[in-house]
Swiss-Prot record:
It comes from the Bacteria. Belongs to the HisA/HisF family. This is 1-(5-phosphoribosyl)-5-[(5-phosphoribosylamino)methylideneamino] imidazole-4-carboxamide isomerase. One of its GO terms (cellular component) is cytoplasm. The gene is hisA. Its main location: cytoplasm. It comes from Rippkaea orientalis (strain PCC 8801 / RF-1). One of its GO terms (molecular function) is 1-(5-phosphoribosyl)-5-[(5-phosphoribosylamino)methylideneamino]imidazole-4-carboxamide isomerase activity. It is an enzyme of class 5 (isomerase).
Length: 257
């Protein structure tokens, strides 16, 4: 399973939010390139970048930081936040972004998603951010009546490369991932699902391994890396390619100290 470090960009700095609340942001580093290099040096093979200003404004904002990160590391990155038209996505691909993540537009303009998936095969992922099973949009500032599982099925049919599923109530809380929601989602679609939100420990990561056969192929880790609750190199050894071994999902955390 892929372990993907998250770098959230706000005003060009690396921050973390609590449950997506812009008023509860904590700056971890003024230099996101430094952070990206740190994760790459520890063995990351992919990075997840979120343009928080972009998510709010509906267009990419932190382009300079994104470009600097891409130039500063040799591993691919995916980017989400405010990608609501073709021009914004092309702009990112021209910078060297490997994969673009659309969210709001999946709810508001699925036809555009279909066109993008056809034009950029395997390059468009759909971020589904849910509150109580319903999809939130516009930087998590609004909640729609769209059911997350139904949207995932529609996006899979339109050609999305993957679904990145975030449980907003758990994001930035270190309260553990929503395994039941992930199980339901992955069971209903044929494309990969990447889990996001709430990871707090190595035990949480090991607990996701039972979902891998269903199609949960990766996990995005944010706050736990920055607080030190999860050590990236240890996480990669535990659940990444060439991991120690397949571990039962409800392993006693005491085994790992």
């Amino acid at each position: 399973m892929d372990v993907i470090p998250a770098i959230d960009l706000l005003d060009g700095r690396c921050v973390r939010l609590y449950q997506g609340d812009y008023q509860q942001s904590q700056v971890y580093n003024d230099n996101p390139v430094e952070v990206a290099r740190q994760w790459a040096d520890q063995g990351a093979t992919y990075l997840h970048l979120v343009d928080l200003d972009g998510a709010k404004q509906g267009k990419p904002v932190n382009l300079a930081s994104i470009e600097a990160i891409i130039r500063g590391i040799s591993i691919p990155v995916q980017v989400g936040g405010g990608l609501r038209d073709r021009a914004s996505i092309v702009q990112l691909f021209n910078l060297g972004v490997d994969r673009a993540i659309v969210g709001t537009v999946a709810v508001e303009n699925p036809t555009l998603v279909k066109e993008l998936c056809a034009e950029f095969p395997r390059k468009i992922a759909v971020g589904i951010d849910a509150r109580n099973g319903k999809v939130a949009t516009r930087g998590w500032l609004e909640t729609s009546e769209v059911i997350a599982t139904e949207l995932a099925q529609e996006m899979a049919q339109l050609g999305a490369a993957a679904i990145i599923y975030t449980d907003i109530h758990r994001d930035g809380t270190l309260s553990g991932p929503n395994r039941e929601a992930l199980r339901e989602l992955a069971s209903n679609i044929e494309i990969p699902v990447i889990a996001s939100g709430g990871i707090s420990s190595l035990t949480d990561l090991l607990g996701l391994l039972s979902l891998e056969p269903l199609g949960v192929t990766g996990v995005i880790v944010g706050k736990a890396l920055y607080t030190g609750d999860v050590d990236l190199s240890e996480a990669l050894r535990a659940i990444g390619p060439g991991r120690w071994q397949d571990v039962p999902p409800d392993i006693d955390s005491s085994l790992f100290g």
